[in-house]
């Protein structure tokens, strides 16, 4: 493959423990096949907050807030070997982790 080739993997999840476990599996697989790794780089956590009224009828001042946090990581694989690409395609990650791969 070309010298300047790079694979960028973006991972998103609501649970940071599952996300860290998945990044560890990807890094371990890439290192085992002889690729050079940059990361995992933690990106800012996006927090979506939803405010709803507690009462269905009155009490506008009484509200409840819910939030959902989206944790993100980036892993760059520099100079991947064909074995690295095959191993990453066969890798089975936990449910709840969104994976985006750019070449």
From Swiss-Prot:
SUPFAM superfamilies: Ribosomal protein S10. GO terms for biological process: translation. InterPro entries: Ribosomal_uS10, Ribosomal_uS10_CS, Ribosomal_uS10_dom, Ribosomal_uS10_dom_sf. Signal peptide: none annotated. SMART domains: Ribosomal_S10 (SM01403). Keywords: Ribonucleoprotein, Ribosomal protein. One of its GO terms (cellular component) is ribosome. One of its GO terms (molecular function) is tRNA binding. The keyword Ribonucleoprotein applies. It comes from the Bacteria. HAMAP family: Ribosomal_uS10 (MF_00508). Involved in the binding of tRNA to the ribosomes. Belongs to the universal ribosomal protein uS10 family. PANTHER family: 30S RIBOSOMAL PROTEIN S10 FAMILY MEMBER. Part of the 30S ribosomal subunit. This is Small ribosomal subunit protein uS10. It comes from Magnetococcus marinus (strain ATCC BAA-1437 / JCM 17883 / MC-1). The lineage of its organism: Bacteria, Pseudomonadati, Pseudomonadota, Alphaproteobacteria, Magnetococcales. The gene is rpsJ.
